[in-house]
C-alpha cells in the first residue's frame, strides 16, 4: 500500500510578487517570479552591517537593489536579460523633482492629440488579437507611435523610460492576459476599450509612477550586464 506524505507548508504570499503591488517603484510592473520587498528587507536587516555592500547575481526586477537603496545601502546587481537591466536601472535611478515636473508636462502635451491609424507598428506576435481586441490594439499602436515621436524609443534617458514603463503597464492592463496565478493564461474574451478609457488609464498609471519616482533614495544601486555563472570579468565593480 502506497503511503502519501502530505506536507503542510504555510503559504507566504507576503514573500511573493503579490506583496509588492502597493510599494511605490516595486509595483511599477508585475512580474510573477519576483520575490517580495518584505523578504529582502528582513534578510538585509538580519545579515548586513552599516558598511555592507550588497551583491545580487540574479537581479530580475531589481527588488534587492531598490530595497538596499531605500535602506541606505549600496548594491551591485547582475542580469543577462536586456529588458530587466533596463527596468532595474530605471527603478533604481535617483530622479530630480524638477525634471519629473517637466516630464509630466511633456507627457500631458503628448496625450492631448492622438491620431488613430491601422498602419502604425504592432509587434509580430502570432494571433495578436488573442491578446488585444482589434480596436484596442489600434489605439495602443497609435499611442505608441506618438510616444516614440515625442520621447524616442526606450534608451538611456531614465526620465523618458518612465513613460515607457507606464506604457508597458498599460498594454498589460488592457490585454486579455490573466495573472491570477503564477503562470499566465488568457481570459475568454478580449475587451474593446474606447480611446478615452485607455487615455484615462494611461494617465493614472503614469501619475502613480511619477509620484513614486519622487521618493528619495539614500543608497545607490546599479544593474550590470553579466552572467552570474562567471562574474570574474567584472572585477570589483
Segments the model singles out, each with a brief description of its role:
Residues 1-50:
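S-adenosyl-L-methionine
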Residues 13-20, 62-63, 114-120:
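Short amphipathic alpha-helical segments, especially helix-boundary/capping motifs
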Residues 20-22, 121-126, 183-187:
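Short linear capping/connector segments at secondary-structure termini
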Residues 26, 30, 78, 130, ...:
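Short, charged/polar micro-motifs that form catalytic or ligand-binding hotspots
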Residues 32, 36, 84, 136, ...:
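Hydrophobic (often cysteine-bearing) scaffold residues that line and stabilize catalytic clefts
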Residues 36-39, 43-112, 194-235:
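Conserved S-adenosyl-L-methionine
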Residues 81-150:
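Conserved phosphoryl-transfer catalytic core
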Residues 137-237:
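SAM-dependent nucleic-acid methyltransferase catalytic core
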Amino acid at each position: 500500500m502506497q503511503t502519501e506524505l502530505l506536507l503542510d507548508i504555510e503559504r507566504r504570499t507576503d514573500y511573493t510578487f503579490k506583496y509588492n503591488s502597493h510599494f511605490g517603484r516595486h509595483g511599477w510592473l508585475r512580474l510573477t517570479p519576483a520575490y517580495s520587498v518584505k523578504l529582502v528587507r528582513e534578510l538585509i536587516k538580519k545579515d548586513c552591517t552599516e558598511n555592507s555592500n550588497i551583491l545580487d547575481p540574479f537581479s530580475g526586477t531589481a527588488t534587492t537593489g531598490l530595497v538596499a537603496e531605500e535602506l541606505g545601502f549600496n548594491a551591485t546587481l547582475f542580469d543577462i536579460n536586456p529588458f530587466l537591466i533596463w527596468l532595474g536601472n530605471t527603478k533604481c535611478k535617483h530622479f530630480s523633482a524638477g525634471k519629473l515636473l517637466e516630464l509630466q508636462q511633456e507627457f500631458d502635451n503628448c496625450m492631448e492629440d492622438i491620431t488613430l491609424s491601422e498602419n502604425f507598428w504592432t509587434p509580430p506576435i502570432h494571433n495578436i488579437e488573442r491578446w488585444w481586441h482589434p480596436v484596442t490594439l489600434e489605439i495602443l499602436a497609435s499611442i505608441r507611435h506618438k510616444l516614440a515621436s515625442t520621447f524616442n524609443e526606450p534608451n538611456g534617458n531614465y526620465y523618458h523610460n518612465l513613460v515607457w514603463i507606464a506604457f508597458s503597464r498599460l498594454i498589460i492592463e488592457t490585454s486579455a492576459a490573466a495573472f491570477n496565478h503564477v503562470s499566465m493564461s488568457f481570459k475568454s474574451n478580449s475587451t474593446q476599450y474606447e480611446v478615452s478609457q485607455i487615455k484615462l488609464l494611461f494617465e493614472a498609471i503614469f501619475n502613480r509612477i511619477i509620484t513614486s519616482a519622487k521618493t528619495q533614495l539614500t543608497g545607490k544601486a546599479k544593474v550590470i550586464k553579466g552572467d552570474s555563472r562567471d562574474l570574474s570579468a567584472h572585477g570589483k565593480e
